């Protein structure tokens, strides 16, 4: 009898909703879906270009890997950005948003982008916050790489960005 009642209840549910399980897109904010379905700036630049900074970061807890590259003009403004991400939809969306937000900005402006801003824009749940942290870390790593290339090209001692300063920005 329990089996018949369960079967009737399930069939009744199925007749009201052809898919008794929630559609995955209902679990994500529209901004995540938009950037996942239509990611901006996918690709890469030549990492040996002195005007390109490359940041490669990963999250061991989930296996996400993010490569973000920024291309500068002669005056220190970011003119383009590209990414390649191996990871979940939230990581791809965070990468896409990051590349959009860095364009047209200077190094100083870019270093003010915080993971909390990306997370808020995408309405990421707590379990996905590491995706926005990866995006922020990738931006910082790309800027660090670019500065190291510029210092080396100018014959200067390679100056690294103070990690305390970088972590303070991301807080």
UniProtKB/Swiss-Prot annotation:
| The UniProt record lists the keyword Metal-binding | yes
- InterPro entries attached here? ISCU (IPR011339), NIF_FeS_clus_asmbl_NifU_N (IPR002871)
GO CC terms on record? cytosol; mitochondrial matrix; mitochondrion
Q: Which UniProt keywords apply?
A: 2Fe-2S, Iron, Iron-sulfur, Metal-binding, Mitochondrion, Transit peptide
All disulfide bonds of the chain are none
The answer on whether this UniProt entry bears the keyword Transmembrane helix reads: no
Known tissue expression:
Mostly expressed in flowers and pollen, and, to a lower extent, in leaves and roots.
Q: How is the cofactor bound?
A: Binds 1 [2Fe-2S] cluster per subunit.
| Entry's Gene Ontology BP terms | iron-sulfur cluster assembly
Sorted alphabetically, which SUPFAM superfamilies does this protein's record hold? Answer: SufE/NifU
Main localisation: mitochondrion
Report the cofactors. Answer: [2Fe-2S] cluster
Could you point out where the transit peptide sits in the sequence? 1-49
Compartments annotated for it: namely: Mitochondrion matrix
The pathway where this protein functions is: Cofactor biosynthesis; iron-sulfur cluster biosynthesis
One example of the protein's molecular function in GO is: 2 iron, 2 sulfur cluster binding
Name the protein family.
Belongs to the NifU family.
Q: How does it assemble?
A: Component of the core Fe-S cluster (ISC) assembly machinery.
Protein name in UniProt? Iron-sulfur cluster assembly protein 3
